[in-house]
Structures are given as C-alpha cells and as structure tokens.
A protein has these predicted regions:
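Extracellular/periplasmic helix-loop-helix junction of adjacent transmembrane segments
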Residues: 11-45, 63, 83-92
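C-terminal ends and interior cores of transmembrane alpha-helices
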Residues: 21, 68-87
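Helix-loop junctions at membrane interfaces in 12-TM secondary transporters
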Residues: 26, 79-96, 153-160
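Central cavity-lining transmembrane alpha-helices of secondary-active solute carriers
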Residues: 33-52, 61, 66-75, 138
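Cytoplasmic helix-loop-helix junction between adjacent transmembrane helices
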Residues: 87-134
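Glycine-rich segments within core transmembrane alpha-helices of 12-TM secondary carriers
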Residues: 104, 124-151, 173-174
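Symmetry-related core transmembrane helices of the 12-TM Major Facilitator Superfamily/SLC fold
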Residues: 161-179
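Flexible cytoplasmic inter-helical loops of multi-pass small-molecule transporters
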Residues: 183-204
C-alpha cells in the first residue's frame, strides 16, 4: 500500500509540473490525478487474473509476483525522466507504470486477504484478515510521513528536482523486506488440501 498511495501524494505536489508542464497548472493537476485513477481501473483486472492463477499455482507464488511488480514499477517512477527530458514519453511511461501498480495491488489485496483467512485459526479468521486493512493505514502513514520529512529537509527547488524521487526509490528497501518475509511463508492448509483433490471435469449436456 505504501507504493500505491505514495503516487497519489506526489501527484498533487509534483507530477503536474514534471510530467504535464505543457498545459495550464489547473489542467496539469487534473491530468496528474487522472493518471492516479488509472491504477484503480486496473485493480479489478489484477484481482481476476492473480485470483485465477492463485487458485492453481498457489497464493504465495502470486503474492511474490505482486510484490515484485509493485516494487519495480514504483522504483522506476522514481528514476523516470521528466517531460523536459524525453517529451511525451514521460507521461506515457508514467501512466504505464501506474497501470502496473494498479494491476499488482489488485492481486495483492485479494491474495493477502485470502491467505490470511485460510491460514488463521477457526476462531480468529476475522481478526487475521483485518491485518490487510491495517496495512492500508500503515502504508498511508509511512508514505505521507516520508514525503513530509523530505519536503522539510529540502528547499522547494530541491524537492521538485530530486527530493520527490527518494520515497519511490526507497520502495526497493520495502520490497526486499517483503520478499524476505513472504519467502518464509507457507501455503495455507486449505489450499494444499484443495490442490490434492482430483479435478473432476463435468461434461455439458449436448442438445440434440
């Protein structure tokens, strides 16, 4: 959630100037928030695709993939050249990376919630699954706090030039930590039992 929400915070402060300077400030802000919305459009698609393969290949494997996708997309935003450097390719690449973020978080949300419920004791399933929602708040606090800290430690010119990029690149640290944690996880017992069951293919009746 840190990566996904960080984009929205920075879009309001920087992206209208860095990636949409060719239009008016008001329209640039609207364009920046429009790219923010792209992530939400791709979330359902990510949930469907990762959910489909998660039922066949495992929740853990899909969650490892979503972390990789989210981390790489976020870090690349942190090193993405501005409109002044590469022209229209800058906003095009920004939208593409935002779409990848949305696609990844769609799979992350459903997969993490499902794994939490399946791995929890029978009398604590609701409590364990609430951790997914808690992660949203933690990500919001961390992203907001880091952007605020860097903006206080830099001048306006420095923040617009390179300071805003630091929280995005910092995502690499969080990705490494998340991969280390998830590598030690095990698939839920429910999934393992379901995978061991023989698959029965039902034939559809053919009308004469």
């Amino acid at each position: 959630w840190y990566d996904f929400l960080l984009y929205g915070i920075t879009a309001a402060l920087v992206f209208n100037r860095e990636f949409f300077p060719q239009i008016s400030p008001a329209m640039g802000t609207l364009a920046a928030f429009a790219t923010f919305g792209v992530g939400f459009l791709f979330r359902p698609l990510g949930g469907i695709i990762f959910g489909h393969f998660g039922d066949r290949l495992g929740r853990k494997r899909m969650l490892m993939m979503t972390v990789w996708m989210m981390g790489i997309a976020t870090a690349l935003i942190g090193v993405l050249p501005s409109f002044a450097s590469i022209g229209w390719w800058a906003p095009v690449l920004l939208v593409t990376l935002r779409a990848i973020q949305g696609f990844a978080v769609g799979g992350e949300w459903g997969g993490a919630a499902l794994l939490s419920v399946e791995s929890a004791p029978k009398n604590k399933k609701a409590f364990y699954s609430s951790g997914v929602q808690v992660g949203y708040g933690v990500g919001l606090l961390l992203s907001t706090g880091l952007v605020s800290l860097i903006s206080q430690l830099t001048t306006d010119e420095q923040f617009l030039s390179w300071g805003w990029r630091i929280p995005f690149i910092f995502s690499v640290v969080l990705v490494i930590a998340a991969l280390w944690i998830r590598n030690g996880m095990e698939e839920s017992t429910e999934f393992e039992q379901q995978r061991e069951k023989p698959v029965v293919k039902k034939r559809l009746p053919v009308r004469s």
